[in-house]
UniProtKB/Swiss-Prot annotation:
It is a multi-pass membrane protein. This is Antiholin. The keyword Transmembrane applies. It comes from Escherichia phage lambda (Bacteriophage lambda). Keywords: Cytolysis, Formylation, Host cell inner membrane, Host cell lysis by virus, Host cell membrane, Host membrane, Late protein, Membrane, Transmembrane, Transmembrane helix, Viral release from host cell.
Length: 107
């Protein structure tokens, strides 16, 4: 029995290669940062996974913002370095500023 061709699967994997590399870079940086700062293993892995998920979509966000998608790798490393706590606080401050609230940290 002959196995069917797997060209579609290979094409799908190769199409996501750039995003996968960015996610791996963000995961590695977040994991190393968390372990260096003395974080617990579980918390570090969860934070690194969330950074990888954010970094997976960074190329699309850069395109949306009109920036070069060549910045995706360094942006992924930056995402891993600052972590999800910092990203969350940046989003909260931005939303509070847009909503006209004076202090977005108390919400």
């Amino acid at each position: 029995m002959k196995m069917p061709e797997k060209h579609d699967l290979l094409a799908a994997i190769l199409a996501a290669k750039e995003q996968g590399i960015g996610a791996i870079l963000a995961f590695a940086m977040a994991y190393l940062r968390g372990r260096y700062n003395g974080g617990a293993f579980t918390k570090t892995v969860i934070d690194a996974t969330m950074c990888a998920i954010i970094a997976w979509f960074i190329r699309d966000l850069l395109d949306f913002a009109g920036l070069s998608s060549n910045l995706a790798y360094i942006t992924s490393v930056f995402i891993g370095y600052i972590g999800t706590d910092s990203i969350g606080s940046l989003i909260k401050r931005f939303a509070a500023k847009k909503a006209g609230v004076e202090d977005g940290r108390n919400q």
